[in-house]
């Protein structure tokens, strides 16, 4: 249920291909500014590949042609929206369907039945309640997992380089699996097995949609199908175990089991939530720590807030909610890292943006990465400045884009809480330090990551 999610060229173009295959779009560009196809068969795919990612392609396209632009995927028209003003005209606040969920389900070959409005609303509420209840019931577990990572880092000599991406992914995998799927994943080997299968599925979904490469490679296809089958098998087992029984630990699956959903719906929704939450949580944790090591004054201010609010007492969910500056740091992390730079919606009916007509069944991209660095929307857009979120109008814009408030997706809400707890635990005891000379380059994938491992060092506060 990720309302606004990023797609890298490998992934998003595959999703675009899937949607446009299912819903053929108009051949007419309707007078929308943009570029003509580079090749008859592939459209502007070569231009996107040459740009390095879809996000970078859209940045260049919007710089050249303005807030509403068009390009071609194969022989199908795609429209991209690149400012807050045009997004406001297109975003429907009453939409309950999530485009990322729908497309990800199609790539997993699940049934993407939209159902009726009331059913979609009910499933959305189940998701939201599932996140709320699993965070509340498993808060002590979250503290425990954070403290385990703290103990590991405390054991390192101050000169030792810490592989941040690796550790954050491991922490996210443990947190998500145990809080979403339960005590099965208290076993370290089960987490490792899940992480391996998750990695295989995550890296393969979308591949081969353009050239059929997955179907052409018997080995790759079998590895993908085996990994997906193993993930589904463990989920089916857990769903069966949780039905009709009471457990002291309330996990995410329980909220779906207790709702009016059949086993296949529970399986699909849990799979989508698990796949997305693991990566979003891992990357939010990674980028937050990266920025804190780069901006020492911001780390100092965050530590002072944590010390003032938490003191020497236990960390509680109520206290975490009081960490206002921490939330600003996380919002600015999402914005600066462009954690989710592209989203997509199918144009259900013919629509109009400014003076442009968007034909029915056109794929409309929300170029969120472009919007998040738009100087017309953000002052000093390339500066990491958490205090910009003191401004209520800035928060309203952020909420409109789906990163906060009532439009905030459940996976991101989950990640915000997990990251806030982890930072509170770590900063109480440690200074987080950058490695001199390290340059972290960004890779725009399904969730934005660093191209290489990001290294940090730590030193003890006491």
UniProtKB/Swiss-Prot annotation:
Question: What is the originating organism of this protein?
Answer: Bos taurus (Bovine)
What's the domain of life for this entry?
Answer: Eukaryota
Query: In its keyword annotation, does this UniProt entry include Endoplasmic reticulum?
Result: no
Subcellular localization, as worded in the UniProt entry: Membrane
The catalytic activity of this protein is classed by the Enzyme Commission as 1.14.-.-
Annotated PANTHER family: CYTOCHROME P450 20A1 (PTHR24280:SF4)
Q: Which Pfam families would you find in this protein's record?
A: p450 (PF00067)
Q: Which residues bind heme?
A: 409
Q: Name one GO cellular component term.
A: membrane
UniProt-listed InterPro entries: CYP450_20A1-like, Cyt_P450, Cyt_P450_E_grp-I, Cyt_P450_sf
Bilayer disposition of the protein: Single-pass membrane protein
What family is it from?
A: Belongs to the cytochrome P450 family.
One of the entry's Gene Ontology molecular-function terms is: iron ion binding
Q: Which UniProt keywords apply?
A: Heme, Iron, Membrane, Metal-binding, Monooxygenase, Oxidoreductase, Transmembrane, Transmembrane helix
Q: By which gene is this protein encoded?
A: CYP20A1
Q: Where are the transmembrane segments?
A: 4-24
Q: Please give the name of this protein.
A: Cytochrome P450 20A1
Q: Which cofactor does it need?
A: heme
